[in-house]
Protein backbone atom coordinates (compact mmCIF):
# COMPACT_ATOMS: atom_id res chain seq x y z
CA UNK A 1 0.00 0.00 0.00
CA UNK A 2 2.82 2.35 0.84
CA UNK A 3 4.10 2.32 -2.74
CA UNK A 4 0.72 3.13 -4.29
CA UNK A 5 0.24 6.82 -4.99
CA UNK A 6 -3.41 6.46 -6.07
CA UNK A 7 -6.41 4.71 -4.57
CA UNK A 8 -6.80 1.08 -5.69
CA UNK A 9 -9.06 -1.90 -5.05
CA UNK A 10 -7.63 -4.49 -2.68
CA UNK A 11 -7.58 -7.83 -4.50
CA UNK A 12 -7.86 -11.40 -3.34
CA UNK A 13 -6.24 -14.12 -5.48
CA UNK A 14 -8.53 -13.59 -8.49
CA UNK A 15 -11.01 -10.87 -7.59
CA UNK A 16 -11.64 -7.97 -5.22
CA UNK A 17 -12.57 -8.89 -1.65
CA UNK A 18 -16.34 -9.02 -1.31
CA UNK A 19 -17.84 -7.98 2.02
CA UNK A 20 -21.35 -7.71 3.39
CA UNK A 21 -22.84 -4.33 4.32
CA UNK A 22 -22.32 -5.22 8.00
CA UNK A 23 -18.66 -6.10 7.38
CA UNK A 24 -18.24 -2.88 5.41
CA UNK A 25 -19.47 -0.84 8.37
CA UNK A 26 -17.15 -2.69 10.78
CA UNK A 27 -14.10 -2.13 8.55
CA UNK A 28 -14.82 1.58 8.33
CA UNK A 29 -15.34 1.82 12.10
CA UNK A 30 -11.71 0.67 12.57
CA UNK A 31 -10.47 3.90 10.92
CA UNK A 32 -7.36 2.21 9.47
CA UNK A 33 -5.42 4.76 7.46
CA UNK A 34 -5.96 4.33 3.73
CA UNK A 35 -8.42 1.44 3.97
CA UNK A 36 -12.08 2.04 3.21
CA UNK A 37 -14.82 -0.45 2.39
CA UNK A 38 -17.13 0.96 -0.28
CA UNK A 39 -19.66 0.00 -2.95
CA UNK A 40 -18.12 -0.20 -6.42
CA UNK A 41 -19.25 -1.47 -9.81
CA UNK A 42 -16.71 -3.96 -11.13
CA UNK A 43 -16.25 -6.03 -14.26
CA UNK A 44 -17.14 -9.63 -13.49
CA UNK A 45 -14.90 -12.63 -14.10
CA UNK A 46 -15.68 -16.18 -15.21
CA UNK A 47 -19.22 -17.03 -16.31
CA UNK A 48 -21.97 -14.46 -15.83
CA UNK A 49 -25.70 -14.29 -16.38
CA UNK A 50 -26.69 -13.01 -19.83
CA UNK A 51 -29.78 -11.19 -18.58
CA UNK A 52 -27.82 -9.27 -15.91
CA UNK A 53 -25.01 -8.62 -18.39
CA UNK A 54 -21.46 -7.36 -18.12
CA UNK A 55 -19.57 -4.13 -17.47
CA UNK A 56 -16.19 -3.00 -18.74
CA UNK A 57 -13.98 -0.02 -19.50
CA UNK A 58 -14.45 1.47 -22.96
CA UNK A 59 -13.33 5.09 -23.32
CA UNK A 60 -14.74 5.52 -26.83
CA UNK A 61 -18.18 4.21 -25.85
CA UNK A 62 -18.09 6.25 -22.62
CA UNK A 63 -17.38 9.41 -24.63
CA UNK A 64 -20.22 8.56 -27.01
CA UNK A 65 -22.75 8.04 -24.19
CA UNK A 66 -21.58 10.51 -21.55
CA UNK A 67 -19.19 12.96 -23.22
CA UNK A 68 -20.81 15.90 -21.45
CA UNK A 69 -20.16 14.46 -17.96
CA UNK A 70 -16.72 15.95 -17.31
CA UNK A 71 -16.59 15.05 -13.59
CA UNK A 72 -16.63 11.30 -14.25
CA UNK A 73 -13.49 9.44 -15.36
CA UNK A 74 -13.54 7.95 -18.87
CA UNK A 75 -12.13 4.77 -17.31
CA UNK A 76 -15.34 4.29 -15.30
CA UNK A 77 -16.80 0.81 -15.99
CA UNK A 78 -19.98 0.99 -18.08
CA UNK A 79 -22.60 -1.60 -19.00
CA UNK A 80 -21.84 -3.43 -22.24
CA UNK A 81 -24.58 -6.06 -22.30
CA UNK A 82 -27.84 -7.12 -20.62
CA UNK A 83 -29.50 -5.05 -17.92
CA UNK A 84 -26.10 -3.55 -17.09
CA UNK A 85 -26.22 -1.87 -20.50
CA UNK A 86 -29.90 -0.91 -20.67
CA UNK A 87 -29.84 0.59 -17.15
CA UNK A 88 -26.32 2.00 -17.43
CA UNK A 89 -27.31 5.65 -17.14
CA UNK A 90 -28.99 4.88 -13.81
CA UNK A 91 -26.14 2.71 -12.48
CA UNK A 92 -23.33 5.07 -13.46
CA UNK A 93 -21.45 6.37 -10.41
CA UNK A 94 -22.11 10.02 -9.61
CA UNK A 95 -18.51 11.19 -9.68
CA UNK A 96 -15.36 9.57 -8.30
CA UNK A 97 -14.79 8.22 -4.81
CA UNK A 98 -11.37 8.93 -3.25
CA UNK A 99 -9.36 8.25 -0.10
CA UNK A 100 -7.74 11.49 1.08
CA UNK A 101 -4.92 11.69 3.60
CA UNK A 102 -2.10 14.08 4.47
CA UNK A 103 1.24 13.49 2.74
CA UNK A 104 4.73 14.88 3.03
CA UNK A 105 6.54 16.74 0.25
CA UNK A 106 7.60 13.44 -1.36
CA UNK A 107 3.95 12.38 -1.52
CA UNK A 108 4.35 9.79 1.23
CA UNK A 109 1.51 9.45 3.77
CA UNK A 110 2.12 11.01 7.15
CA UNK A 111 1.16 8.07 9.33
CA UNK A 112 -0.75 8.69 12.50
CA UNK A 113 -2.96 11.25 10.76
CA UNK A 114 -6.59 10.57 10.00
CA UNK A 115 -7.56 9.41 6.50
CA UNK A 116 -10.71 10.84 4.98
CA UNK A 117 -12.97 9.02 2.49
CA UNK A 118 -14.83 11.22 0.06
CA UNK A 119 -17.44 10.21 -2.47
CA UNK A 120 -19.99 12.36 -4.29
CA UNK A 121 -21.74 12.28 -0.92
CA UNK A 122 -25.21 11.73 -2.32
CA UNK A 123 -27.34 9.52 -0.06
CA UNK A 124 -29.57 8.64 -3.04
CA UNK A 125 -26.97 7.46 -5.57
CA UNK A 126 -25.91 5.14 -7.01
CA UNK A 127 -29.35 3.60 -7.40
CA UNK A 128 -30.00 -0.14 -7.41
CA UNK A 129 -31.90 -2.15 -10.00
CA UNK A 130 -34.38 -4.59 -8.47
CA UNK A 131 -34.84 -7.42 -10.96
CA UNK A 132 -37.80 -9.80 -11.10
CA UNK A 133 -35.55 -12.87 -10.85
CA UNK A 134 -36.36 -15.39 -8.12
CA UNK A 135 -33.03 -16.29 -6.51
CA UNK A 136 -33.70 -19.99 -5.84
CA UNK A 137 -35.40 -20.61 -9.20
CA UNK A 138 -32.66 -18.76 -11.08
CA UNK A 139 -30.03 -20.91 -9.37
CA UNK A 140 -32.03 -24.05 -10.15
CA UNK A 141 -32.37 -23.02 -13.81
CA UNK A 142 -28.63 -22.58 -14.15
CA UNK A 143 -27.99 -25.89 -12.36
CA UNK A 144 -30.30 -28.01 -14.54
CA UNK A 145 -29.08 -26.44 -17.79
CA UNK A 146 -25.50 -27.17 -16.71
CA UNK A 147 -26.25 -30.68 -15.42
CA UNK A 148 -27.95 -31.66 -18.70
CA UNK A 149 -24.97 -30.33 -20.68
CA UNK A 150 -26.90 -27.93 -22.90
CA UNK A 151 -24.27 -26.42 -25.20
CA UNK A 152 -26.57 -23.89 -26.86
CA UNK A 153 -30.06 -23.08 -25.60
CA UNK A 154 -31.57 -22.50 -22.18
CA UNK A 155 -34.86 -21.72 -20.48
CA UNK A 156 -37.26 -18.89 -19.63
CA UNK A 157 -39.64 -19.02 -16.66
CA UNK A 158 -42.41 -16.42 -16.33
CA UNK A 159 -44.86 -15.60 -13.57
CA UNK A 160 -48.22 -15.89 -15.39
CA UNK A 161 -50.00 -13.30 -13.24
CA UNK A 162 -47.39 -10.51 -13.37
CA UNK A 163 -45.59 -11.58 -16.57
CA UNK A 164 -42.26 -11.11 -14.82
CA UNK A 165 -39.17 -13.19 -15.58
CA UNK A 166 -38.52 -15.48 -12.60
CA UNK A 167 -35.57 -17.26 -14.20
CA UNK A 168 -33.61 -17.05 -17.42
CA UNK A 169 -30.57 -19.12 -18.36
CA UNK A 170 -28.74 -19.04 -21.68
CA UNK A 171 -25.94 -21.19 -23.09
CA UNK A 172 -23.19 -20.91 -24.11
CA UNK A 173 -22.24 -19.02 -20.94
CA UNK A 174 -20.76 -15.58 -21.35
CA UNK A 175 -17.00 -16.09 -21.08
CA UNK A 176 -15.27 -12.95 -19.87
CA UNK A 177 -11.81 -14.41 -19.32
CA UNK A 178 -11.30 -15.45 -22.95
CA UNK A 179 -11.31 -12.55 -25.42
CA UNK A 180 -11.95 -14.81 -28.43
CA UNK A 181 -14.86 -16.61 -26.76
CA UNK A 182 -16.28 -13.40 -25.31
CA UNK A 183 -17.82 -12.07 -28.53
CA UNK A 184 -19.22 -15.44 -29.59
CA UNK A 185 -20.87 -16.04 -26.20
CA UNK A 186 -22.22 -12.49 -25.67
CA UNK A 187 -25.60 -13.21 -27.30
CA UNK A 188 -28.51 -14.11 -25.02
CA UNK A 189 -30.14 -17.03 -26.85
CA UNK A 190 -33.41 -16.51 -24.95
CA UNK A 191 -33.84 -13.11 -26.63
CA UNK A 192 -32.75 -14.35 -30.06
CA UNK A 193 -35.23 -15.75 -32.63
CA UNK A 194 -34.80 -19.42 -33.63
CA UNK A 195 -36.71 -21.99 -35.72
CA UNK A 196 -39.64 -22.99 -33.45
CA UNK A 197 -40.75 -26.11 -35.34
CA UNK A 198 -44.02 -27.62 -34.16
CA UNK A 199 -44.43 -25.14 -31.28
CA UNK A 200 -45.63 -22.81 -34.07
CA UNK A 201 -48.60 -25.12 -34.68
CA UNK A 202 -50.12 -23.39 -31.65
CA UNK A 203 -50.44 -20.25 -33.81
CA UNK A 204 -52.05 -22.16 -36.70
CA UNK A 205 -54.39 -23.90 -34.24
CA UNK A 206 -55.45 -20.52 -32.80
CA UNK A 207 -56.26 -19.25 -36.32
CA UNK A 208 -58.17 -22.41 -37.26
CA UNK A 209 -60.31 -22.24 -34.11
CA UNK A 210 -60.88 -18.47 -34.18
CA UNK A 211 -61.72 -18.47 -37.92
CA UNK A 212 -64.19 -21.30 -37.25
CA UNK A 213 -62.74 -23.62 -39.89
CA UNK A 214 -65.12 -26.57 -40.19
CA UNK A 215 -63.44 -29.50 -38.43
CA UNK A 216 -66.61 -31.50 -37.74
CA UNK A 217 -66.01 -35.16 -38.63
CA UNK A 218 -62.89 -34.08 -40.55
CA UNK A 219 -59.82 -36.31 -40.54
CA UNK A 220 -56.31 -35.97 -41.93
CA UNK A 221 -54.02 -38.51 -43.58
CA UNK A 222 -51.04 -38.56 -41.23
CA UNK A 223 -49.41 -41.36 -43.20
CA UNK A 224 -48.22 -38.63 -45.60
CA UNK A 225 -45.50 -36.03 -45.15
CA UNK A 226 -46.31 -32.32 -44.91
CA UNK A 227 -46.57 -32.06 -48.74
CA UNK A 228 -48.92 -35.05 -48.95
CA UNK A 229 -46.45 -36.75 -51.28
CA UNK A 230 -44.30 -39.27 -49.40
CA UNK A 231 -44.25 -41.29 -46.19
CA UNK A 232 -43.37 -39.27 -43.08
CA UNK A 233 -40.74 -40.36 -40.54
CA UNK A 234 -43.56 -41.74 -38.37
CA UNK A 235 -46.81 -43.05 -39.85
CA UNK A 236 -49.65 -42.00 -37.53
CA UNK A 237 -52.66 -43.13 -39.55
CA UNK A 238 -55.85 -41.10 -39.87
CA UNK A 239 -56.26 -38.46 -37.14
CA UNK A 240 -58.75 -35.73 -36.30
CA UNK A 241 -57.66 -32.16 -35.46
CA UNK A 242 -57.24 -32.66 -31.70
CA UNK A 243 -55.31 -35.90 -32.16
CA UNK A 244 -53.15 -34.21 -34.80
CA UNK A 245 -52.20 -31.45 -32.37
CA UNK A 246 -51.41 -33.85 -29.53
CA UNK A 247 -49.26 -36.08 -31.74
CA UNK A 248 -47.92 -33.19 -33.86
CA UNK A 249 -48.93 -34.39 -37.33
CA UNK A 250 -47.24 -32.16 -39.93
CA UNK A 251 -49.68 -32.99 -42.74
CA UNK A 252 -52.69 -31.69 -40.80
CA UNK A 253 -51.14 -28.29 -40.16
CA UNK A 254 -49.60 -27.83 -43.60
CA UNK A 255 -53.04 -28.53 -45.11
CA UNK A 256 -54.81 -26.14 -42.74
CA UNK A 257 -52.11 -23.51 -43.21
CA UNK A 258 -52.74 -23.43 -46.95
CA UNK A 259 -56.49 -23.14 -46.44
CA UNK A 260 -56.02 -20.19 -44.08
CA UNK A 261 -53.60 -18.36 -46.42
CA UNK A 262 -55.94 -18.73 -49.38
CA UNK A 263 -58.51 -16.64 -47.49
CA UNK A 264 -56.17 -14.17 -45.73
CA UNK A 265 -52.52 -13.57 -46.59
CA UNK A 266 -51.78 -11.98 -43.20
CA UNK A 267 -53.55 -14.59 -41.07
CA UNK A 268 -50.38 -15.92 -39.40
CA UNK A 269 -49.12 -12.43 -38.52
CA UNK A 270 -52.55 -11.67 -37.03
CA UNK A 271 -52.52 -14.68 -34.71
CA UNK A 272 -48.86 -14.45 -33.71
CA UNK A 273 -49.75 -10.91 -32.55
CA UNK A 274 -52.96 -12.09 -30.86
CA UNK A 275 -50.89 -14.59 -28.88
CA UNK A 276 -48.41 -11.91 -27.73
CA UNK A 277 -45.46 -13.26 -29.70
CA UNK A 278 -44.84 -10.74 -32.49
CA UNK A 279 -42.17 -8.04 -32.59
CA UNK A 280 -40.47 -7.44 -29.23
CA UNK A 281 -42.38 -8.50 -26.12
CA UNK A 282 -40.10 -7.01 -23.43
CA UNK A 283 -41.16 -3.98 -21.35
CA UNK A 284 -40.85 -0.66 -23.15
CA UNK A 285 -42.11 2.81 -22.37
CA UNK A 286 -41.28 6.22 -21.01
CA UNK A 287 -38.81 6.49 -18.13
CA UNK A 288 -38.18 10.11 -17.12
CA UNK A 289 -36.37 11.84 -20.00
CA UNK A 290 -36.19 8.64 -22.09
CA UNK A 291 -39.49 8.29 -24.03
CA UNK A 292 -38.64 4.93 -25.64
CA UNK A 293 -36.84 3.00 -22.92
CA UNK A 294 -36.49 -0.79 -23.34
CA UNK A 295 -35.62 -3.11 -20.48
CA UNK A 296 -34.18 -5.69 -22.88
CA UNK A 297 -32.97 -3.83 -26.01
CA UNK A 298 -31.01 -6.91 -27.16
CA UNK A 299 -34.30 -8.75 -27.77
CA UNK A 300 -35.01 -9.35 -31.46
CA UNK A 301 -38.50 -9.57 -32.94
CA UNK A 302 -40.33 -12.45 -34.61
CA UNK A 303 -40.01 -13.27 -38.32
CA UNK A 304 -42.65 -15.31 -40.15
CA UNK A 305 -42.00 -14.64 -43.84
CA UNK A 306 -38.70 -14.04 -45.62
CA UNK A 307 -40.58 -12.40 -48.49
CA UNK A 308 -44.19 -11.81 -49.54
CA UNK A 309 -43.89 -14.06 -52.62
CA UNK A 310 -43.67 -17.13 -50.37
CA UNK A 311 -47.30 -16.59 -49.35
CA UNK A 312 -48.27 -17.71 -52.87
CA UNK A 313 -46.06 -20.81 -52.83
CA UNK A 314 -47.91 -23.93 -51.62
CA UNK A 315 -44.75 -25.61 -50.33
CA UNK A 316 -43.44 -22.46 -48.66
CA UNK A 317 -46.76 -22.08 -46.83
CA UNK A 318 -46.69 -25.74 -45.79
CA UNK A 319 -43.18 -25.34 -44.36
CA UNK A 320 -44.14 -22.09 -42.61
CA UNK A 321 -47.24 -23.66 -41.02
CA UNK A 322 -45.05 -26.14 -39.13
CA UNK A 323 -42.56 -23.51 -37.93
CA UNK A 324 -39.89 -23.96 -40.59
CA UNK A 325 -38.86 -22.01 -43.73
CA UNK A 326 -38.28 -18.42 -42.48
CA UNK A 327 -40.11 -18.63 -39.14
CA UNK A 328 -37.98 -17.42 -36.22
CA UNK A 329 -39.28 -16.73 -32.70
CA UNK A 330 -37.34 -16.10 -29.50
CA UNK A 331 -37.85 -18.33 -26.44
CA UNK A 332 -38.98 -15.20 -24.56
CA UNK A 333 -41.75 -14.56 -27.13
CA UNK A 334 -42.84 -18.21 -26.99
CA UNK A 335 -42.94 -18.04 -23.19
CA UNK A 336 -45.09 -14.93 -23.54
CA UNK A 337 -47.40 -16.81 -25.92
CA UNK A 338 -47.88 -19.57 -23.33
CA UNK A 339 -48.47 -17.02 -20.56
CA UNK A 340 -51.04 -15.25 -22.77
CA UNK A 341 -52.95 -18.50 -23.29
CA UNK A 342 -52.71 -19.30 -19.57
CA UNK A 343 -54.23 -15.85 -18.77
CA UNK A 344 -57.22 -16.55 -21.04
CA UNK A 345 -55.86 -14.36 -23.83
CA UNK A 346 -54.71 -11.28 -21.90
CA UNK A 347 -51.54 -9.99 -23.59
CA UNK A 348 -48.79 -8.30 -21.57
CA UNK A 349 -45.24 -7.09 -22.00
CA UNK A 350 -42.56 -9.07 -20.16
CA UNK A 351 -40.71 -7.45 -17.26
CA UNK A 352 -37.15 -8.23 -16.18
CA UNK A 353 -36.92 -5.33 -13.72
CA UNK A 354 -39.52 -4.48 -11.10
CA UNK A 355 -38.18 -1.10 -10.00
CA UNK A 356 -35.23 1.21 -9.54
CA UNK A 357 -34.42 1.90 -5.89
CA UNK A 358 -32.48 4.77 -4.30
CA UNK A 359 -29.34 3.99 -2.33
CA UNK A 360 -31.31 4.58 0.89
CA UNK A 361 -33.95 2.00 -0.12
CA UNK A 362 -36.72 4.36 -1.23
CA UNK A 363 -38.43 3.73 -4.59
CA UNK A 364 -37.03 5.77 -7.48
CA UNK A 365 -39.12 4.36 -10.35
CA UNK A 366 -41.58 1.45 -10.54
CA UNK A 367 -42.22 -0.34 -13.83
CA UNK A 368 -45.97 -0.69 -14.08
CA UNK A 369 -47.42 -3.65 -15.99
CA UNK A 370 -48.06 -2.94 -19.68
CA UNK A 371 -50.62 -4.67 -21.87
CA UNK A 372 -49.88 -5.38 -25.54
CA UNK A 373 -52.18 -3.64 -27.99
CA UNK A 374 -54.05 -5.21 -30.90
CA UNK A 375 -56.32 -8.18 -31.46
CA UNK A 376 -57.06 -10.43 -28.51
CA UNK A 377 -58.35 -13.98 -28.82
CA UNK A 378 -61.92 -14.71 -27.84
CA UNK A 379 -62.56 -16.58 -24.60
CA UNK A 380 -63.92 -19.59 -26.55
CA UNK A 381 -60.80 -19.76 -28.75
CA UNK A 382 -58.45 -19.60 -25.76
CA UNK A 383 -60.37 -22.29 -23.87
CA UNK A 384 -60.11 -24.64 -26.87
CA UNK A 385 -56.38 -23.86 -27.18
CA UNK A 386 -55.91 -24.65 -23.50
CA UNK A 387 -57.61 -28.02 -24.00
CA UNK A 388 -55.39 -28.77 -27.00
CA UNK A 389 -52.23 -27.96 -25.03
CA UNK A 390 -53.38 -30.12 -22.13
CA UNK A 391 -54.17 -32.93 -24.57
CA UNK A 392 -50.49 -33.01 -25.61
CA UNK A 393 -49.83 -34.38 -22.11
CA UNK A 394 -53.00 -36.38 -21.39
CA UNK A 395 -53.88 -37.95 -24.75
CA UNK A 396 -52.62 -41.37 -25.70
CA UNK A 397 -49.42 -41.02 -27.76
CA UNK A 398 -49.30 -37.25 -27.12
CA UNK A 399 -45.79 -35.81 -27.40
CA UNK A 400 -45.89 -34.62 -23.76
CA UNK A 401 -46.94 -37.82 -21.98
CA UNK A 402 -43.66 -37.75 -19.99
CA UNK A 403 -45.12 -34.90 -17.93
CA UNK A 404 -48.18 -36.84 -16.70
CA UNK A 405 -46.44 -37.96 -13.50
CA UNK A 406 -45.46 -34.46 -12.35
CA UNK A 407 -46.94 -33.04 -9.12
CA UNK A 408 -48.26 -30.01 -11.05
CA UNK A 409 -50.47 -30.51 -14.14
CA UNK A 410 -48.78 -29.32 -17.35
CA UNK A 411 -50.20 -28.07 -20.66
CA UNK A 412 -47.85 -27.36 -23.54
CA UNK A 413 -46.42 -28.08 -26.97
CA UNK A 414 -43.26 -29.82 -28.12
CA UNK A 415 -41.26 -28.96 -31.19
CA UNK A 416 -38.33 -30.30 -33.19
CA UNK A 417 -37.11 -27.94 -35.89
CA UNK A 418 -34.67 -28.55 -38.72
CA UNK A 419 -31.95 -25.89 -38.71
CA UNK A 420 -30.40 -26.35 -42.15
CA UNK A 421 -27.15 -27.34 -40.42
CA UNK A 422 -26.92 -31.03 -41.27
CA UNK A 423 -28.52 -33.24 -38.63
CA UNK A 424 -28.67 -30.44 -36.05
CA UNK A 425 -32.14 -29.63 -34.71
CA UNK A 426 -33.80 -27.27 -32.24
CA UNK A 427 -35.66 -29.24 -29.57
CA UNK A 428 -38.39 -27.42 -27.61
CA UNK A 429 -41.02 -27.81 -24.97
CA UNK A 430 -43.15 -24.79 -24.14
CA UNK A 431 -45.99 -24.82 -21.66
CA UNK A 432 -47.63 -23.60 -18.47
CA UNK A 433 -48.71 -25.06 -15.13
CA UNK A 434 -50.67 -25.92 -13.09
CA UNK A 435 -53.30 -26.35 -15.80
CA UNK A 436 -56.29 -25.67 -13.54
CA UNK A 437 -54.88 -22.48 -12.02
CA UNK A 438 -51.86 -21.37 -14.08
CA UNK A 439 -49.03 -19.66 -12.22
CA UNK A 440 -45.97 -20.36 -14.39
CA UNK A 441 -45.07 -20.40 -18.08
CA UNK A 442 -41.89 -22.26 -18.99
CA UNK A 443 -39.95 -22.70 -22.22
CA UNK A 444 -36.94 -25.00 -22.52
CA UNK A 445 -34.92 -25.26 -25.74
CA UNK A 446 -31.87 -27.22 -26.86
CA UNK A 447 -30.55 -25.39 -29.93
CA UNK A 448 -28.66 -26.80 -32.90
CA UNK A 449 -28.11 -30.13 -31.17
CA UNK A 450 -27.09 -33.32 -32.94
CA UNK A 451 -27.62 -35.37 -29.79
CA UNK A 452 -30.17 -38.17 -30.01
CA UNK A 453 -30.90 -37.63 -26.30
CA UNK A 454 -33.89 -35.43 -25.47
CA UNK A 455 -32.49 -33.10 -22.80
CA UNK A 456 -35.48 -30.74 -22.85
CA UNK A 457 -37.91 -33.09 -21.10
CA UNK A 458 -35.77 -33.76 -17.99
CA UNK A 459 -35.01 -30.04 -17.64
CA UNK A 460 -38.71 -29.11 -17.84
CA UNK A 461 -39.56 -31.85 -15.33
CA UNK A 462 -36.80 -30.75 -12.93
CA UNK A 463 -38.00 -27.14 -12.99
CA UNK A 464 -41.63 -28.12 -12.33
CA UNK A 465 -40.48 -30.39 -9.49
CA UNK A 466 -38.32 -27.63 -7.98
CA UNK A 467 -41.21 -25.16 -8.07
CA UNK A 468 -43.56 -27.66 -6.43
CA UNK A 469 -41.01 -28.31 -3.69
CA UNK A 470 -40.41 -24.59 -3.15
CA UNK A 471 -44.13 -23.84 -2.91
CA UNK A 472 -44.69 -26.64 -0.41
CA UNK A 473 -41.76 -25.55 1.76
CA UNK A 474 -43.51 -22.20 2.16
Where does each model-flagged region fall?
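Short amphipathic C-terminal alpha-helix that caps PH/PH-like domains
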Residues: 1, 83, 341, 459-467
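Extracytoplasmic/periplasmic proteins that interact with beta-lactams or build/remodel peptidoglycan
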Residues: 1-152, 174-176, 367-369
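Envelope-exposed proteins and targeting segments
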Residues: 47, 125-129, 151-153, 218, ...
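Beta-lactam-recognizing serine transpeptidase/beta-lactamase-like catalytic domain environment
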Residues: 116, 159-192, 196-197, 206-446
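Short beta-strand scaffold segments in enzyme catalytic cores
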Residues: 155-157
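Short, gly/Ser/Thr-rich active-site loops of penicillin-recognizing serine hydrolases
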Residues: 363, 368-373, 459-474
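A short acidic/glycine-rich loop-to-helix N-cap element
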Residues: 448-458
Amino acid sequence: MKNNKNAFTLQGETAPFRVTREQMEKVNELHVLGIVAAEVRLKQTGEINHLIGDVGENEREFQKRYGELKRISKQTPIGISGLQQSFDEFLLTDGEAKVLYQVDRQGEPIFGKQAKYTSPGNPFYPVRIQTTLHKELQQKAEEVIEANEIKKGGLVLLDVKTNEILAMASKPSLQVRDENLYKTTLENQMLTPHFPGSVFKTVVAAAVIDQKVNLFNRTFNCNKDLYGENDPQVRMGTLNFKESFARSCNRTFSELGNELLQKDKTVLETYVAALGANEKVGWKGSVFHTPHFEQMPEEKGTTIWGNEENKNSKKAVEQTAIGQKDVRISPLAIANMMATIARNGEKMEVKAVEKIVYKNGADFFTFESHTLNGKQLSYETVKTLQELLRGVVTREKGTGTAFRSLPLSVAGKSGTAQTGKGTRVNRWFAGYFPYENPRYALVVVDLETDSKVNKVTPIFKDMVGAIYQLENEK
